[in-house]
Amino acid sequence: KGLDLYTYTNVTGVRLDGEKRVQGVDTDKGFIPCGKVVNACGVWSPEIGRMAGLEIPVEPRKGVILVSAPSFKFCNQKVQEFGYMISKFSNHECKRDPELEKYEVSFVIEPTDANNVLIGSSRNFAGYDISTEMEIIHVIAKRAIRFYPILKDLNCIRTYAGLRPFLADHLPLITQVDEVPGYYIATGHEGDGISMAPTTGRLISELIAGE
């Protein structure tokens, strides 16, 4: 049957009946009746969860990326240091430079089709703030130059930040909610949401279909 896609539509509430069964979703463009709701809202999943009386322990974990000016192709694939996994899992048993520890900085580089490179990355908790602090930029740049000295000769043309949906056990939350029949959750993938999307979609579809 296909689907209807509602773009630029804000969810304002999840309607439940007296037995807490899902009845539909309220939006700023009207009510959408449905018996199943999947909360796959990443860092905003706690807000949508509260609409159904649920507390979802996801926190936004910020990451900053630097973008270089175009250059000759000195990097043809994504490269990351092993410390990336140490930062991701907040393993403080492995002692590193204090400035790396402060913002969980580890080196990762990825080329683009336009011969820019994306350079990261950091991990810190700053709520929903997506500003890029100069201190973090300097730490990322310093770490990157240690691995690729050529980077010191490139200009950084911009920076940006994103938010990862973090859970304390570092495992995604993919489940149906027995207390609220018809409510499903798929969140907490942190930085692995794209790579885990196919499996997550399959698991959620099987839960909904009762397979």
What are these regions, as identified by a protein language model?
Residues 13-16, 21, 31-32, 41-159, ...:
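Active-site substrate-recognition segment that forms the wall
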